[in-house]
Design a protein with these regions (language model features):
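Segments surrounding the PLD/"HKD" phosphodiesterase catalytic module and close analogs
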Residues: 14-34
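Bergerat-fold GHKL/Histidine-kinase-like ATPase
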Residues: 30-328
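Divalent-cation
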Residues: 1-18
Length: 328
């Protein structure tokens, strides 16, 4: 039985007393197999749950670092984070940094579009920092040595203004939320797998904020000169009028979703990526009145035509290249 963060694992083994086979917990001790006592099993389960809590803390910490770096931004962003269950180890030195830099400057971030989205790669504390540019709408990713990674992507949408040209409401279509999620997951998973040599399961989360000040980590920051947070909704567009068609009058400044994922499934950009994206997108969009996204099913079936006008063609092209338009 290989090691995993889900241990201890029970196996069918001969009973120590005259009876049928029972479930027992093995442990490798040198070249021999040892059987765990009840105390050993209890300790192992405690270690499992402690490790899960530490991953949650790790996820929150690296996301907070990213939000702190972008704290001045006042427009809607999607923040996606992936933390492997078994940490990897990306070595950072001069020779390897040159290689990482070349890889990342040519990497494809936006699915269905040519590579080369990023313009700058730099070194931070135990991480690589990758940015599109210096603008307030540019993407920023932080790729950590242990394989954990997070990225913030500005959301495309509409800005509704009053007579004085002051923003009163930001809206985005479901496709403008799901597409950047679909792009971020394989990019982050590829870092964990290919640079840090992490593998297996990971914890993935997605956070949608109307304004970086709406992120939970920023609630303790008081800035009297900062403008108020502009309300945000996810609205479909009425094809007849071209105007937003809200499902709910409520606006939420902050929404989150989380799921367990397989790194290989995400990095390989196959059906597993669609299934993971569907689980996250459905949970995220429920905050805005949608039972499910309607764009990707939990089985991994994709509906490119349901995406927004600016993303549907790109999604269809990418899906065709990867054989994901075939019915299941």
């Amino acid at each position: 039985m290989p090691r995993s963060p889900a241990g201890p694992h029970a196996v069918t083994a001969p009973a120590s007393r005259p009876s049928k086979d029972t479930l027992r917990y093995p442990r490798r001790g040198g070249s021999r197999t040892e059987w765990l006592t009840e105390n050993d099993v209890a300790t192992a389960y405690r270690a499992r749950f402690t490790a899960a809590a530490e991953r949650e803390q790790r996820l929150a910490a690296i996301e907070e670092d990213l939000v702190d770096a972008l704290a001045a931004r006042t427009t809607p962003h999607l923040i996606v984070t992936v933390v492997p269950e078994q940490p990897g180890d990306m070595v950072i030195d001069s020779a390897r940094f040159d290689r990482y830099q070349q890889e990342l400057l040519g990497a494809q971030l936006y699915l269905g579009q040519p590579g080369g989205a990023f313009g700058r790669v730099s070194v931070g504390p135990r991480r690589l920092i990758v940015t599109e540019g210096a603008g307030r709408y540019s993407a920023r990713a932080e790729l950590h040595r242990d394989g954990s990674a997070t990225i913030a992507l500005s959301l495309s949408g509409r800005i509704h203004v009053d007579d004085y040209e002051e923003a009163q409401l930001h809206t985005a279509e479901p496709g403008d939320v799901v597409y950047p999620l679909l792009c971020a997951l394989p990019f982050l998973a590829a870092h964990a797998r290919d640079r840090a040599a992490a593998s297996g399961l990971a914890q993935a989360s997605v956070t949608l904020v109307a304004d970086m000040a709406a992120h939970p980590s920023q609630t303790r920051v008081l800035d009297p000169d900062r403008p108020d947070i502009v309300p945000f909704r996810v609205d479909r567009i009425d094809p007849g009028t071209g105007r937003p068609r809200p499902l709910t009058p409520e606006s939420y400044p902050h929404a989150t979703a989380a799921a367990g994922v397989l790194l290989d499934n995400l990095a390989d950009q196959g059906r597993g990526l669609l299934q993971a994206a569907a689980a996250l997108a459905d949970e995220l969009l429920q905050a805005y009145g949608y039972p499910e996204s309607g764009l990707i099913t939990r089985a991994g079936e994709l509906n490119p035509a349901g995406f927004s006008q600016r993303t549907c063609g790109t999604v269809a092209q990418w899906a065709e290249q990867h054989g994901l338009l075939e019915p299941l």
